[in-house]
Structures are given as structure tokens and as C-alpha cells.
């Protein structure tokens, strides 16, 4: 069993955890005694965590499932919101958009070619681009969050786990849904409207042979930020997504599914930052410091504060054929293309002329990328006591980067510059290439009626290189200070698990898993050997799952040993992507769904994480530190709490449904809590503990296809930041949205 220790844990946090464990232990001391007369039953949940459809009860993996109904009750409209209802998951970090950290595992995402260590899948297709974290949940059927290394079956970059998103499928029954929402952000100085429309339709084109589905989502949000330069509104969102699917089933054994997705965000402002210190580039200007007040910014850019453009297109083709008495062979092919552009106001001056002769300094960045994926997967039938899965996988990704800082002199009238259009300034550009192949297999053997052994492994062969770093527009030439030779990496990720089914309602499992992640090149900082070498993780996990007529519960205890953790480190002047030698993590997670009656349901989740860096010396950035001055040139981070790894986090959702003569009235309230979070490993930038409260009231008239809802998000108007863009001279947080209240109308047909 993993050994647990608590370093400097807060008394209240430990007390909360002990209290929660005690309560749940008491409740489950006799699981079958939970069944109550009059309590509504809980439906079985199917997942594909082991690449075949199975009951979540039978899978020896820690999984949290959010169904479409769960998302509606919690008013979750953004993929990042699921961190409030999934134990051990937090959307935060050093990216302006926030990226998932599962059990404290997250890498720095600084530029093209850097991929998050939590694998994101949409309809079975891996999503390498980090902008998928801005995905709106318009046509989602289910989200499965798999925790712990998932490399054996899900492949590359699943060190922390995998988030598997399933969207609505084509059906042979004509049906659809339209949802209209309007909300107002009332917690900032700018009352901002937020309008969205989602529509979904499916039905047959040829009965029992050909079916379609189509979903469209559009959102238009006024900015809730105040630009201190002129008092104007900033931070608007304008985006849409269209998804089309075509299902052809020429026979009972064969199915072909074609999917097309188009997404675009215009003037989508992802950066809403304020400096945390006075030792910044902005100190050159008396009126040029970013505001310290949340939801206030300062920018002399036209078109908003840090305007951003995102466009993506993807295509996927899945062909499945069932061989009678043997199994199913599936071919999955996909192609995706992304284009991301945004401008950062580096000087942030409030003066129209940037206090000449100092320049207006704006930084335009572009991240074009495309990827190709091909997988062949065979899923066997049950042969006596044995079943197995085997497959091969190919992945190719080209991730570009171009940056333009302009102008170097204050040549533009009015003090405004557009880095994209400027002909004067510092220009850099590069492309990172990744090519990966893998072969994998997993076998399940029933040792007895109650005990099942799972054994699997994945062999990975990967190559990554970068080229084309350029100065003053000289492209296609590898910079002399960069080693552009390919970095090759091979690994084998094994998995061993035992699942003991004590009864239909109670099971236990233990697993040992190893995960790996290949080298990562950063194309941003322009330094020699600017890449992080491969990282490795070994995990031991012990868990239990219990189900009954009116409850579902899971608990897991885990211990991680992390080697060569890829992270942002300091070289004494600026940040680079490198490796922290080692880290350790231990924790416990709980997930409980319980129906007290036909009218009342409770969902409680909790996670406790003890994490620390191992022995690692690192340089300290020059200049005054944001919160913790360190005059030393070199420090050892050994024993420090890892970043994006709160010790305690928990959430509670209560849903009460009243069945009235005229219809159904549903009231739902939820709260989520997170302990302190550090945003980089020198522990300079921290967000103190915070609690967020959401609520909704909905009414569905009898004999009607309409549901009307009132909702409130962040009702306490909690001011906390979820991301921090770090620099030795300018640490800038990105705050969460303020309080929002609104109304929604759903119509199903």
C-alpha cells in the first residue's frame, strides 16, 4: 500500500477530509443497507475507458462520469467548468486559457509543439491543440474523466489521465433540441450580456441504412472587463461551432461514420491580465501599469484587449466491421487543421502615445498546426475466460509558430501598432514536427468468477524536431544557437490490474501502471537546447466501487513516482521548458451519487493530494520576486508543494425535484472548494483557497417539450485567478468570470 504523509497541511483542510471520510465510511459500512423504499433508482452508466463499452462498475480505473443531465443540472457550458464537479481535476496553469491538471499533473504549454499531459478525445479522436479546452458543451452526451496514466490504450500524452468526450450520434428516429440562453455578468463594473443558441437534429435519410445528425452552436458575449485606458468595455467573445455526422450501415455487421467539425472564434479575448508586482516593463510609464483590480485591464490596442482569432476544421472517418463469433475491427482516420492568432499589448500604456519616446510594444503571435491520425483497433469477443484488445496507431503533427514584436521605435501615429501588419520589428518563426507510431494490446483473463486479471502494454516510437527559427523575416534557416537535430524517444508502458467482484454491488481493484511522454521542444524562447527530455511516471492505485438501487460510489488511493517532470524552469533570466528531476504524489479521491428519495439527489466529490518536488537545483530569475524575494542565485525546490496541485478540493451538488400537477419543478445548487494553488515551482505566485457557488431553478410543464430555467454562476462573485502568465519581470494572472445570472429555454422535439 502506498505510504502517505502530510507536510504542513492546513488544520481545517485535514479536518474536512477526515470528517468526509468518516461520514462515507459509516454510510458504506453496510452498502446494501442503503436501499430505501421510495428512493429512485440510478441508471447504469456505460463507459469506453478500456476501448469497449462496459459498465463503469466493472472497470478497474478511477473514472468520473458527467452525463448530459449532469451537465445541465450544474449549468456547465464550458469544458473547463467540469473541474468544479470532478475530484482531482483543476483547469488552471500558465496558459491564458487554462488547461487540465489531473492529480497535479500538468506541463507548461508555452508554444507550438507543446502538448498537455492529459489526453483529450472527442468522439474517439485525439485533440492535440490546447484550444480544445475552450470547447462549448452544446451537443455532449457524456464526458468520462479517466484518472491515472492511460498510455496503454489511449497512447501519447496521457500521463495524468484522459478526458473522453462523446457527442450526440446519428439516429434513425427523428428528434432534435433547441436551447437558447441569455445571461448577464453583474459582478464587474461592466454589465455584460452573454447570448448563445444551440440546435441539434437527427433522423433517417434511408430507413435503417443511412442517418444524419447536425449540431450548431453560436455564442456572443459582451466583455465584462474594463479597459482603464479609456473606460471602454473589453473581453468579448464571438464564436460558433458546427458539427455534421453521417452514419451508413450497409449491413448488420458494418457501420461507417463520417464526421465534419468547423469552429471559429472572432475577436475572442482570452487574456485578461493584471501584474502582480511593480518590477515590470510597465514601470517605465507612470500611467502604464496594469490595474491590480480584478476584471480591469489597460491596453492601447485597438479592437480590444489582446484580441484573439481561432479557426479549426476537422474530418474523421470510422469504419467498423464485426466478424461473427470473433470480434470487431475498427479503422479510425482523422485530419485536423488549426489556426490561432492573437496580439498582446506588452507596454499596456494608458497614454495614447505610450509616453514617447518610449515605444508602443505589441506582440502578435500565430500558431498554425495540422495533424493526421490513423488507428486500427481489434476488439475481441469473449473466448471462454479470455478477451483482448489490440491495435496499431500512427500520428503526425506539424505545429508552427510565428511571433512579431513591433515597432522597435515609436513610429506609429496615435501610439498604436499591429504586430501582424508591421514591417518593422523583431520576427521569429519555427515549425515543430512530431511523428509517432505505436502498437498496443490488452488482455483480460478471468481467473475465477469473481477475479479478473488485466495485462497490457504499449510500445511507442516517436521523433520530434524543430526548424526554421528566423530573425527579421529570414525563414527556413535553423538558428545557430538551436540544436535542430531530431530527438527520438522509444518507450514501453505496461499496465497490470486485478479486479475482484465481491458481489454485483461491490468490487475492488488494484493496478500498477507506467506512463511516458516524449521530448517536447519549445519554439518560443530561442535558446540553445530549448527542449524538455522525456518524462516517466509509475503509479500504484487501489480502489473500490459500489452500486445499488439508489446509489453509486467510488473511492481510490494512489501513489505516483514522477521522473524528469516537464515544466517551466528559470535559467536566471527567463523561463525555458526543461525537466524537474523528480516528484512524488499520493492522494485519495471519493465520488458519491445518492438518491435520498424520488425527489432529492446528492452528488459529493472530494480529493486530497499530497505532492512534493524532489531534489532539484534551479536558477532564480533576476530582479525582485513577486511575493517571495530570494536573493540567492540558486535554490533547491525539494519538499515544496507542486504547482496546480491543491491539497484539498471538494464539491457538493443537491438537486430537488417536485412533481406538481402542472409540471416538474427542479432546484439545483452546487458548491466547489479548492485549497491554495501555486502557479510555478518557485512558489512566487499563489491563489488562496476559494469557494464557488452555482444554482439553477427549472420548470417543465406537463405534456410539453419545453423547459424554462433560471441560473446563477459564481453567485458569491468570488475573485480568483485560474491562470498566471509568468515572467521574471511581469507576472500576470487571468481571473475567472464574475457573477452571472441568466435564463434558458430548452425545446425538444
Which functions belong to the PLM regions below?
Residues 116-117, 129, 138-141, 152-227, ...:
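Outer-membrane beta-barrel translocator/receptor signature
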Residues 40-173, 187, 542:
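Acidic, small-polar-rich N-terminal luminal/periplasmic segments of exported/outer-membrane proteins
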